[in-house]
Amino acid sequence: MIMAMAVLSAVLFSCVREEMTCDKELIVVQRIGEGGYVYTRGAAISSNTDLKEETFGLYGSLTPNASVPQPYFNASATVNADLTATISPLQYWPGLLNASMKFFSWYPYSDANAPTASFTDPGEMVLNYTANESAANHVDVLAAISGPIWVEGVNIHFYHTLTKVTFTFKKVAPVPNEVTIEKIEFQNVGKSGNLAMTEIPTTTTKNGKPKFVWSDVATGRVASTPTGNKTVTEDATLIGDTFLMLPTDAFSATAKIVVTTNFGDREFLFSDILAKNPHSWESGEYINYNL
């Protein structure tokens, strides 16, 4: 009995010192949300219901009292039918007082074209993303940062970080009787980059969405090869895949769109397009080019 009492005293002492507590509360994701108006949302995720049964990355950053952020866990979570999420493996609130936690989330998590997340600084998430050369394989990159009240449920609100781009074609005289679109290609546009996030940006786009800024951007080619309807008619018709591109406020002098038809290639320099219709690619926004 004396030995048992001594062990119990040691346990109690270890829990109380350094502002620690002994209770283990499960970290619960109580709500998954998604931001943006329906007409500007991404192609893959149009609402939070599209995230049901999907898996996203979830990183916990812990800041003890009067200290600096430190890693706590790096896991994943799967969205349930009721728009809660189950963390795998299960995570528990640390037994600390006067501490805080921040949760970083990113989607997609396990897709072959998913971004990679790094946390060299535990208080910052850096997403590295490379757009697939084929628009058919593009993914809708979402990001979220949550700072819940200690030991309360976590609400995760995802935002779109890329720009949705599509093409509409319409036959205008004197084009030949039958025109088909064989390929649509962006050349010398942003293809890969890094998105560093400590908070959701307070700077917004023209439609009030967070303006995510990608850095270390490398340019390249991204194309769509239509497989369904690709015939241009007198009625304006969307043709080709939806592109999900890195946002940019400044296109290079050599950036262009190359459209391949059954009659050959036609090039459209962005400098010429912008001269007639000034615009930029903003995160969470939808750009459609009429050709």
Task: Give the ranges of each region predicted by the language model.
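Sec-type signal peptide cleavage vicinity
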Residues: 1-2, 10-291
